Amino acid sequence: MEKELFHPKMESIAAKDQQRLEQDLLAEQIRYVYDHSEMYQEKFKTAKMTGRDVKVVQNLYRLPFTTKRELRESQKRKPPFGDFLAAPSDKVRRIHRTSGTTGSFVYTALTANDADVTHDCGARSFWAAGLRPHHRVVHCLNYCMWMGGYTDHANLEKTGASVLPFGVGNSR
């Protein structure tokens, strides 16, 4: 029998429990970033905040905004990932980057857990759209350093579907 939900426990949680879980995870994430990222420690300090000041979604507006320019400058100051990285660099398992069409590119560094969470979220989205293990997908996105191609491929595989990696490439 085919399961209706990809992640039944998370996708059928009561609204009150979901709100509490979101608040707990948000507070935990903000604390983690504050405790482990030099750039965000400085940004929070400038905003007269700590990693414990935002505990609910309604308070997200209080967080200091980060621009792409700041990320680029951070990566120039402290290559390759910048001082906004909140994980030890030896825990980085995958590296993507932006295209650089609006300036220099920005690296995105993922730990194994980051990649797993990304693939779980993507697979849940594909599952909600009706994708199932008996389906076959011709995947035509570009397999380069930007996140879309490979990430979508892995998300599709996580649903159990068969994936044909067709993607665009060098035609010479």
Residue map of PLM features:
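Conserved AMP-binding loop of ANL adenylate-forming enzymes
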Residues: 127-163
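Positions that flank functional sites
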Residues: 59, 141, 170-171
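Nucleotide 5′-phosphate-binding alpha/beta core
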Residues: 1-97, 102-120, 124-128, 132-133
